[in-house]
From Swiss-Prot:
Residues the record lists as 4-carboxyglutamate modifications: 62, 66, 69
Modification after translation (UniProt): Gamma-carboxyglutamate residues are formed by vitamin K dependent carboxylation by GGCX. These residues are essential for the binding of calcium. Carboxylated in a Ptprv/Esp-dependent process. Decarboxylation promotes the hormone activity.
Species annotation: Mus musculus
Residue positions assigned to the propeptide: 24-49
Task performed by this protein: The carboxylated form is one of the main organic components of the bone matrix, which constitutes 1-2% of the total bone protein: it acts as a negative regulator of bone formation and is required to limit bone formation without impairing bone resorption or mineralization. The carboxylated form binds strongly to apatite and calcium. The uncarboxylated form acts as a hormone secreted by osteoblasts, which regulates different cellular processes, such as energy metabolism, male fertility and brain development. Regulates of energy metabolism by acting as a hormone favoring pancreatic beta-cell proliferation, insulin secretion and sensitivity and energy expenditure.
Record-given protein name: Osteocalcin
Length: 95
């Protein structure tokens, strides 16, 4: 068992150290896989859209909040218990 293991290990070492695995293909096809530094920089440094200051999205509860502010009872309850609970107690509708 030990000899099989050593033989396998030596075979793998021979394959790793051989010059056949390190040989690079020579020809016009081998250069197509790589690009110059300038071409690479053009790809990496292209303009980045959508990275500017984003516009905050409108609050979906804003109309409800404005309607609740017009009613003094709802406004007082919203200060104590929160907008959703106050709106539900006054108007009976779940937001």
């Amino acid at each position: 068992m030990r000899t099989i293991f050593l033989l396998t290990l030596l075979t793998l070492a021979a394959l790793c150290l051989s010059d056949l695995t390190d040989a690079k293909p020579s020809g016009p096809e081998s250069d197509k896989a790589f690009m110059s530094k300038q071409e690479g920089n053009k790809v990496v440094n292209r303009l980045r859209r959508y990275l500017g200051a984003s516009v905050p999205s409108p609050d979906p509860l804003e109309p409800t909040r404005e309607q609740c502010e017009l009613n003094p009872a709802c406004d007082e309850l919203s200060d104590q218990y929160g907008l959703k609970t106050a709106y539900k107690r006054i108007y009976g509708i779940t937001i």
